[in-house]
Design a protein with these regions (language model features):
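An N-terminal hydrophobic leader/cap segment in hydrolases
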Residues: 4, 15-73
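Conserved alpha/beta-hydrolase
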Residues: 116-136
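Alpha/beta-hydrolase active-site loop
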Residues: 140-161
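A short loop-to-beta-strand scaffold at the N-terminal edge of the catalytic core in hydrolase folds
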Residues: 76-87
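Short N-terminal helix/helix-N-cap motif within the alpha/beta-hydrolase-1
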Residues: 57, 106-108, 134
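The serine-hydrolase catalytic nucleophile loop
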Residues: 102-116
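Short beta-strand element of the alpha/beta-hydrolase
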Residues: 93-101
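Primarily recognizes the serine-hydrolase "nucleophile elbow" in alpha/beta-hydrolase
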Residues: 156-160, 165-194
Length: 194
């Protein structure tokens, strides 16, 4: 009987060790996917032009006109956070802040930016979340702390585009979750839609 109990205890300890080890590995893999993200960052424009050929002439025209610009803010922990932005083709107070998903970046959201900017005539701001794209950071934060950065990006967009905007905050995948977390915070008067 003692042998059976001892064997079960050893088996349970091995199972617990495997579960803890596997969990730590998966957590590290999901929050720090370095190789995956570097490859995505390096090929973002090529990927977007291949998947959405209509983007190339639009992005080229924005770049030729100097209308697709970079901006940065300093995060709460001192890290550099990056975003792309472009003014609408005609002056407007309508602005969209577009938040990307897990392991994506601002460039990979240009197809949504095209919809808002080219088709609907909105000003757009596309942030790279913490540890994504050209932003610094130590690990993916899965949206909870990112909500505070998005609130700051909303203020930046409002300032860049005239100070009295009517804003929509749009997210895809993890960006949608971040957007919903932002919606639970006290809102600025210029935010109209999520």
């Amino acid at each position: 009987m003692k042998r059976i109990v001892r064997s079960l205890v050893v088996l349970l300890l091995l199972l617990a060790a495997a579960l803890v080890g596997g969990s730590l590995y998966m957590l590290s893999y999901s929050l720090r996917p370095d190789a995956t993200m570097r490859a995505k960052n390096a090929s973002s424009y090529e990927y977007m032009y291949g998947e959405y050929p209509f983007l190339r002439p639009w992005v080229d025209s924005l770049e030729r006109a100097g209308a697709l610009r970079d901006t940065v803010i300093t995060g709460n922990e001192g890290e550099r956070l990056h975003a792309l932005y472009a003014a609408a083709p005609r002056p407007t107070d309508r602005t969209a802040v577009i938040v990307h998903g897990y392991t994506d970046n601002a460039v990979r959201m240009l197809m949504i930016g095209y919809l808002y900017n080219h088709d609907l005539g909105y000003n757009i701001l596309l942030p790279d979340l913490y540890y994504h794209g050209r932003s610094e950071g130590r690990a993916i934060r899965m949206g909870w702390k990112d909500r505070l950065d998005v609130l700051r990006w909303m203020d930046v967009a409002n300032d860049i585009f005239g100070g009295d905007t009517r804003m929509v905050v749009h997210g895809i995948s993890m960006g949608a979750a971040t957007t919903m977390m932002v919606s639970g915070e006290e809102q600025r008067p210029y935010v109209k839609f999520f």
